[in-house]
């Protein structure tokens, strides 16, 4: 039996408020912004989903998929964003499994490639992501790295 449970928010919609608060606490994006995206996903208004890793009833990892992760290249869509694993649960493959689940989910829906904005180097390459180009983040002074998963 797997130590952790990996789910989409559609599998446990009752976690929406808790998940929005969790993502807000990690990234500082308003909880309402997460709720709006999550509600659209749960109402089947979008196929761009939310993926969580649970340790018992605690969220220990998660990510979402949205149209645009606040950058100047709207043609590079959809974007995996808000990738986070609790420090106490890192180095166990949680983020990698969540990334793979998101890419597999998108492919199953006929959506490919997927994109991701990050300042990290080398981490995402382990999971099949390739550096594509530099993009300008909304309100950001410096360019940031855009990756693609084909």
Please tell me what each predicted stretch does.
Residues 85, 91-104, 116:
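Conserved acetyl-CoA-binding loop-helix of GNAT-fold acetyltransferases
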Residues 48, 141-146:
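Short hydrophobic/aromatic beta-strand or adjacent loop that forms the aromatic wall/cage
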Residues 54-56, 149-150:
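Active-site beta-strand termini and strand-to-loop segments that position acidic
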Residues 50-52, 58-68, 79, 84:
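Conserved beta-strand in the GNAT
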Residues 1-37, 50, 54:
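Short amphipathic alpha-helix that is part of the acyltransferase structural core
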